[in-house]
Amino acid sequence: MARSTLARLRGRLRPPSKGDAEMDYWSRRAAVEGALGNAHYERVFTTQFGLQRSFFDAKRVLDVGCGPRGSLEWATAAARRVGLDPLVERYRELGIDRHAMDYVAAPAERMPFADASFDVVASLNSLDHVDDVDAAVVEITRVAAPGATWLLTVEVGHEPTATEPHSLPWELAEDLAGWRLQWSARNGLRDDHDIYASIDENRPYGGAGPGLLRARLKRATS
């Protein structure tokens, strides 16, 4: 068999990259929705963590693994609104340039920010998507200012997938170096796997199988 034919066959058999799988998901969502909406994000950042909108006033806010919806457009009184995602350049075809926030193309494991750059860091349905969870946590800790808040929502206990390669434990937020756990909650998942709707409904966790962990943590000041 010709070498070029073998190369073509290997290309067809190679599984899609994590980035390709993520883009396929978002492209399908855009096709269904017409335009990717973001009206739900205010309650995701506030109500789902027991916070008021004013908590974010004058703060530098970073959303790690932000996706292409414009997750921080609602935070109009924030001092800075930054979404970090390795797929930012590919998201431009989905219309992110119209959003009233900044986007930075970089992985969570290598953030191009100075130490102590942010007062609020969010990782909402993203920590199990990264390549290296430990490295991502180190970077989140580094870019968070003393006294900063980390808002964490993550699915735990699921089987690894192409886009979510890590199965994380419920105890994830209990002993993170440099952070103090202020509040946490557990929820079950709806059959349609809608994470934020599951939280809105305060769906109880049944004690077995995958579930949702929310945590609000405070960065140590010394």
Residue ranges of each PLM-predicted region?
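Core SAM-dependent methyltransferase catalytic element
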Residues: D192-S222
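A short acidic, Gly/Pro-enriched loop at the edge of an enzyme's catalytic core
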Residues: A106-V121
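N-terminal, positively charged/glycine-rich alpha-helical extensions of SAM-dependent methyltransferases
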Residues: M1-G34
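Conserved alpha-helix/loop element of class I SAM-dependent methyltransferases that forms part
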Residues: N38-K59
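A short SAM/SAH-binding and catalytic strip from SAM-dependent methyltransferases
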Residues: V120-D131
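Conserved class I S-adenosyl-L-methionine
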Residues: L151-W179
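A short glycine-rich, Lys/Arg-flanked "PGG" loop and its adjoining helix->strand segment in the class I
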Residues: D134-T149
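Class I SAM-dependent methyltransferase SAM/SAH-binding core
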Residues: L62, C66-R110
